[in-house]
């Protein structure tokens, strides 16, 4: 999701430049930003698909390869050089803001390559194999409306095995360098990979688009696509996911580490400091942010103590937490639909107040969905942006492993407001 967020920033920057001509903004700088945005979509076609741009839906870059990393480094260096030809002090206030956002975003992406994050090519959250499952199910971001859409997915899928081979090679490089994932994460990744390796192609998640073939497709196209999707599942999907699952279980897991944070890795302190900078967009040190966090925890804990006293609970705060977790009154749901309906109720109560709080509100449709079973066990609630033209809704995904254990005191409203 991080990359999607970056694309939103760059898209906004580009749009602002396009709309700012009459106020004296630099048209040459705006062109550089526009070129950057378009070239970035070509470089990262998965991001383009998420962003609703379907021109590159047939492409899947091998983004962990040495060649791609060199290409990406040259891309960021080239555009930084172009932008730095403009003197910031000579720009309008609006262009200075765009200049600062751009140089920060491009430099952060360039600096990322110093730390060899490609040695940990995916985990249980951020994983192309999971994204491929979402795309290939036929109900995600990848469109399946035309014959060309179906062919685009086959072309994109054809590059997946090569990507997976590179991922395994990078995991092995990480083992040699001591840059490996924690065991606690790897054990969650293994069943994810295994869930995709289904022997019967018609039972595969990736057969979903075939079960939803549009009625206006010709019979010849329907037969061809059914045959080609079946072959792709048998020859690409099943063996690739099996290979990833077997590798993680038999080779990588024994080499994975018992520690948890990045700081436990070689050069881990620098990796962590970089990640903090990238995530917070500040120059605060990890220690400064940690101390800020401690202050916030103390403040919130004080408010929790006040609530405990207001409701006349007899006991300390840990006992109060256990009470809220165990009391059946706080677990009223019996089915996943009831959980989703509760979130929809929050949505309906929130909706009339949006225009009071925000100048601009999204025009695209909005949906609340249960997180797909293949990733629910390791997922958190999350929001996938819709497209500006409204052709794809924004989707709030909620993992519901057991509706009867879903607790209303877990912060449903705050979770919904933050994510959705």
Regions found by a protein language model. Give the residues of each.
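N-terminal maturation segment of proteins
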Residues: 17-420
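Sec-dependent N-terminal signal peptides
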Residues: 4-13
